[in-house]
Amino acid sequence: MPNPPGPNYRERLWPAAWVFVATALVIPASLLVFLPISTTAGIVCAIVLYAAIVVTLLATAPLVEVDDALFVAGRARLPRTVVAGVTPFSGSDATAQRGTQLDARAWLLIRGWIPGLVKVQLDDPSDPTPYWLVSTRHPEQLTAALKN
């Protein structure tokens, strides 16, 4: 029996390394709060708070996936039959799409630590959402997967 076909594209939007470094600032902050009470409490709270933040960041990293029938971005699912067009963006163009050129009706899956974007135009008269804007580290590959 042949294996079922897998996804055409799959990417987990993991946080960048600098996000973990930046969130490590909770360690000295919690030490400042709890060390006057107890050294042990300060150290334990610092470790527990940082671990909780790291686990939360990892557990909430969304999945972007394209298969033959669906485009999945986080918890949202879009039938590929309603995809009217796909445009990749990077650099200052991606920044403009997230900012000045953003339509308030758009559906967003944006992660600030991921520089690339793909804009997926929709052709669904029953949906007021004009497009999806999805963060990706590989905008060209995601675009190619959605166009195939």
Question: Where are the regions that the model predicts?
Answer:
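N-terminal membrane-targeting/pre-transmembrane regions
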Residues: 1-36
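Short, aromatic-rich membrane-interface segments at the entry and exit
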Residues: 37-46
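Hydrophobic, well-ordered secondary-structure segments
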Residues: 5, 26, 50, 119-123
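Non-transmembrane, membrane-adjacent beta-strand/coil modules in membrane-associated proteins
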Residues: 74-133
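Conserved beta-hairpin
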Residues: 47-87
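A structural detector for beta-sheet-dominated domains
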Residues: 67, 123, 135-137
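C-terminal/domain-terminus segments
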Residues: 129-148
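Lipid-exposed faces of alpha-helical membrane segments in multi-pass integral membrane proteins
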Residues: 22-26, 45-52
